[in-house]
Amino acid sequence: MIRLRAQQLINPDFTDVKDVVAWMGAIQAQQPRMAKLALGIRTRGATMQQIKQALDRGEILRTHVLRPTWHYVSPNDIRWMLKLSCNRLKSAYASLMKGHGLTITEQMYDTANQHIYDMLSGGKSLTKEQITERIAEKGLPSDTIFMNRFLENAECEALICSGPEAGNTHTYMLLDERVAPMPLPTKDEALSKLARNYFRSHAPATLDDFCWWSGLSVKEARLGVEIIEKELQKVVLNDKTYLLHDSSSIDIKEKESFIFLPAYDEYIIAYKYRGDVLQVSHNSKAFTNNGIFFPLILQNGRATGNWKMTLTRRNIAVNTSYFDNDTPTDLSAAEEKARLQLISFHN
């Protein structure tokens, strides 16, 4: 229950989605609809429309940071997080290209950056497809592999970030036209900020968990933890050393909870060891070996099944399946309450 509370999954503190993102540090945003729901279940009274508006206004941003995948981040954090992550991200991108037997030279990246800057300058926002068409016109490689790298590199170098959605499609804008430049912390300050953000919102968690979530080396992660050690308490459980942040709520009144957890949610994906909340024998029903994560049913903080949502214009249908094949008969009221919350969120 402590982790549920830290993650804002029970008794959420915030009514504004931008405050949730700032609290969490970063929220994985692989699948846009599921990622918005991840914000919604952590924000009191939030709706899908409110979250879309926050994205459109630039109050939260979607970009590749930390690990080389999509995350929602706060405008106040995006620059220092990118600076902390950039070298590792570039190394990961180079490895991906090498795996395809391809390379991108620095000159190609610089040329792509200039073209992207020119086409977005003046407050414009464009989709990936629109940028791809213009890159192709300039004579650069424009297939999916190259465009992914060009755009990810431009994000990494703090050239671009998310713009207002075009319908439900992600767009890009120049970061400098979306977020005012601001002083950057030193590396030690950035490490401590990232450690504080993680442990206050994900505790109890281990150093290995923090390494996994942040993409930092063990040395960097340990330094970040050491800098804020006065804010942390150590708890040993099952031969693992967990860290609790001073802000962690120990006295939690809630005894029971039932949550439809989105795919790729921080409650599962943000930890290297997931056995605390997911029985190992059920791993294959929660995620695949190549990193696809499924929506889960959480009962009292433990994953007990899967759920699938079907949206129509008038209703939301939810199909559930439980890992132990015996659908609990006493959960109909809990399921219906969670379904009504989904309806309220989708407005």
Segments from the language model and where they lie:
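A short acidic, leucine-rich amphipathic alpha-helix
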Residues: 54, 127-136, 154, 207-211, ...
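A short, conserved structural fragment
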Residues: 58-65, 69-70, 155-165, 229-237, ...
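Positively charged, polyanion-binding regions of nucleic-acid-associated proteins
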Residues: 107-124, 187-203, 225
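Loop-centered beta-sheet repeat module
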Residues: 144-222
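Anionic-ligand-binding alpha/beta catalytic cores of soluble enzymes and soluble regulatory domains
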Residues: 203-252
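Non-catalytic regulatory appendages
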Residues: 231-281
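Glycine-rich, small/acidic residue-mixed loop/short-helix segments
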Residues: 280, 286-347
